[in-house]
Amino acid sequence: MLVMKLFTCFLQVLAGLAVHSQGALSAGNNSTEVEVVPFNEVWGRSYCRPMEKLVYILDEYPDEVSHIFSPSCVLLSRCSGCCGDEGLHCVPIKTANITMQILKIPPNRDPHFYVEMTFSQDVLCECRPILETTKAERRKTKGKRKRSRNSQTEEPHP
């Protein structure tokens, strides 16, 4: 008898949740006015530009893998977005360095300390043609993709 009551309660809760979620889904449809985001706003939000992105510190400083950082990721501006043509991609044309205070924890968990770490941020972005590279060219550049963290650069990064 108790099992039957519990089962009935369970079904009532499920039915209540289903009705509530159905109401939430149809609430927007009952309105006579549908909110539509204008094309210019959609285009502006999605077009190639610097956008904030969480970046893991160890992705930027792979040689520091033996340490723990807090926070483990930082918010940086990076070029992202659409270019409106499949032959183009969004790349940085101007970058700047930003230095942040990060908590660094040694592998043996000895006293941790604050360090200043420099990261590259994208300031200006542009849609540029995608360069087709041959396999031989890719092999030559392999391992040379990381740039120096302490120098400012005006060059686009891959």
From Swiss-Prot:
GO terms for molecular function: growth factor activity. Keywords: Angiogenesis, Developmental protein, Differentiation, Disulfide bond, Glycoprotein, Growth factor, Mitogen, Secreted, Signal. It holds the Pfam family PDGF. It comes from the Eukaryota. Its main location: secreted. Residues 1-18 form the signal peptide. One of its GO terms (cellular component) is extracellular region. Residues 137-149 have a biased composition (Basic residues). Residues 136-158 are annotated as: Disordered. One of its GO terms (biological process) is angiogenesis. The keyword Ribonucleoprotein does not apply. Disulfide bonds join 48-90, 79-125, 83-127. It is found in: Secreted. Antiparallel homodimer; disulfide-linked. Also found as heterodimer with VEGFA/VEGF. Growth factor active in angiogenesis and endothelial cell growth, stimulating their proliferation and migration. It binds to the receptor FLT1/VEGFR-1. Also promotes cell tumor growth. Belongs to the PDGF/VEGF growth factor family. This is Placenta growth factor. The lineage of its organism: Eukaryota, Metazoa, Chordata, Craniata, Vertebrata. The gene is Pgf.
